């Protein structure tokens, strides 16, 4: 899930239990954000796991790590290559069709005139950041945001881990209110700000660079009554405490980026900080959660 991958390692796994084990190990090892881990279940029940690295990984070390956590079965399928990040993202965006999600539709510039007029359009320009709407986690967040907006108008919104800015732009377009967006990754900060302007909500979406809640802007802008955070399970668990401190009573939180088997641990971490789960969407092996702060 890193925005500017150039080196790739991929392998397949036959059992869900082994896939769970190896994804847990890899997301733990790469918590610092120097690699992005993605896992997809194929229709035949096999799992494809892909890692993207900004710097070339030590192949022998990585092979040992995945074989130790997933077993010898993956050894023959493990392959390393490099991808031209910009061309790869551009090419994949050009192939993509608009993605409807509730009242929203996410599309590229080539589809500007072809999307349904009754939807809130979010145009995402080809860029080195995550979040075109096609991934199950982004779609899950948009669907839960749509659900929240049916019964309330949050007044203070945070999109933590904004990537292309897709969720912040969706919230700003629907609410016509200021949204704070943050990302650990400088290119994503630039891309999200550009996409905010492209979608004519640049005056509402303020994008900052921050790791988790480590910036004074959060205390100044908070407490938030809606937080969207589509990052991995491990960072989400670590962020439970600081997030709870930045929430208004009754605030809603939308979490995504976790594989479905990781949801119970994430729910437990947030429940311990006074957040109760309201909804659980499962899309393509990924979970998106809606929680509410009690009191
Ligand atoms: C899966 S992408 C989500 C992008 C977009 N919000 C979406 O829903 O499609 C996760 C984003 O979170 C950022 N990120 C990861 N860990 C973070 C952290 N601890 N603090 C802030 N941003 C983080 C990554 O750089 C990446 O842009």
UniProtKB/Swiss-Prot annotation:
UniProt keyword annotations, A-Z: Cytoplasm, Methyltransferase, S-adenosyl-L-methionine, Transferase
Under InterPro entries, the record lists: Ribosomal_L11_MeTrfase_PrmA, Ribosomal_PrmA_MeTrfase, SAM-dependent_MTases_sf
Which superkingdom?
Bacteria
**Where S-adenosyl-L-methionine is bound, by residue?**
138, 161, 183, 230
Q: Where in the cell is it found?
A: Cytoplasm
GO biological process terms, semicolon-separated? methylation
| Enzyme Commission (EC) number | 2.1.1.-
Recorded GO molecular functions are: protein methyltransferase activity; protein-lysine N-methyltransferase activity
A GO cellular component entry from the record: cytoplasm
- Name the top EC class: transferase
Q: Which reaction does it catalyse?
A: L-lysyl-[protein] + 3 S-adenosyl-L-methionine = N(6),N(6),N(6)-trimethyl-L-lysyl-[protein] + 3 S-adenosyl-L-homocysteine + 3 H(+)
What's this protein's family per the entry? Answer: Belongs to the methyltransferase superfamily. PrmA family.
Q: What does this protein do?
A: Methylates ribosomal protein L11.
PANTHER family recorded for this chain? ELECTRON TRANSFER FLAVOPROTEIN BETA SUBUNIT LYSINE METHYLTRANSFERASE (PTHR43648:SF1)
Name this polypeptide is given: Ribosomal protein L11 methyltransferase
């Amino acid at each position: 899930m890193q925005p500017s991958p150039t080196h790739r390692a991929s392998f397949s796994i036959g059992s869900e239990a082994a896939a769970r084990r190896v994804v847990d190990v890899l997301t733990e090892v790469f918590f610092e954000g120097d690699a992005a881990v993605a896992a997809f279940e194929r229709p035949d029940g096999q799992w494809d796991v892909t890692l993207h690295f900004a710097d070339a990984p030590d192949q022998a070390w990585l092979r040992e790590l995945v074989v130790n956590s997933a077993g010898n079965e993956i050894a023959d399928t493990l392959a390393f290559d490099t991808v031209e990040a910009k061309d790869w993202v551009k090419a994949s965006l050009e192939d993509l069709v608009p993605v409807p999600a509730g009242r929203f539709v996410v599309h590229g510039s080539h589809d500007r005139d072809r999307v349904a007029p009754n939807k809130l359009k979010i145009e995402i320009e080809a860029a080195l950041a995550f979040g075109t709407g096609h991934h199950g986690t982004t779609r899950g967040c948009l669907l839960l945001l749509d659900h929240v907006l049916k019964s309330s108008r949050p007044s203070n919104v945070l999109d933590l881990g904004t990537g292309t800015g897709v969720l912040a732009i969706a919230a700003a377009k629907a609410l016509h209110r200021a949204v704070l967006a943050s990302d650990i990754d400088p290119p994503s900060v630039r891309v999200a700000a550009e996409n905010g302007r492209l979608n004519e909500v640049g005056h509402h979406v303020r994008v900052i660079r921050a790791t988790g809640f480590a910036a004074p802007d959060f205390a100044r802008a908070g407490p938030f009554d809606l937080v969207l955070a589509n990052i991995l399970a491990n960072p989400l668990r670590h962020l439970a405490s600081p997030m709870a401190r930045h929430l208004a009573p009754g605030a809603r939180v939308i979490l995504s980026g976790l594989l479905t088997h990781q949801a119970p641990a994430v729910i437990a971490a947030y429940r311990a900080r006074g957040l109760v789960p309201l909804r659980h969407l499962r899309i393509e092996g990924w979970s998106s959660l809606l929680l509410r702060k009690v009191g």
